[in-house]
Amino acid sequence: MLNFIIPFIILIVVVVFIHEYGHYYFAKKYGVGVTDFSIGFGKEIFGWNDKSGTRWKICLIPLGGYVKFFGDRNVFSQSDQEALIKKYNEKEREKLFILKPLYQRSIIVAAGPIANFILAVVIFLFIYMFVGKDFTPAVINE
């Protein structure tokens, strides 16, 4: 049984990390504050803070993950913009996901699935390069 569970968990963790890192990379590129980068859900098992203030954590249930943006209160990143403008000062408002232009928010949201697509292409390329393609040599029957 462990012969299947451990590789499954490793595979899920890698896929989730690549997916969430896609969101994280473009969020940072566009100046969105990231407070949490989590692999898994539930209670935190292990974690650390980087120099930009992001909490990187590994959690108990490794069946997903999330990137939490600065100022987000709910999972849908929906907030009252007027309330956010009043709540945060000018420097903090520059880090808010919800106040970024639509094209930047779209890229950040799409970056996770696109990262997974690129991962799939890379895996197939490696399989094709190292395993090769099957062929049947021509045989002449008498």
List PLM regions with ranges.
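Helix-interface capping motifs at the ends of transmembrane segments in multi-pass membrane proteins
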Residues: 1-4, 128-130
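Small-residue-rich helix-interface/hinge motifs
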Residues: 3-85
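Hydrophobic alpha-helical transmembrane segments
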Residues: 5-9, 106-107, 118
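A broad, low-specificity signal for short, low-complexity segments enriched in glycine/proline
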Residues: 17-21, 100-105
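General alpha-helical segment detector with a strong preference for membrane-spanning helices
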Residues: 23-24, 116, 120
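A short acidic, glycine/proline-enriched capping/turn motif at secondary-structure boundaries
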Residues: 74-75, 113-116
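PDZ peptide-recognition modules
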Residues: 80-104, 111, 118-142
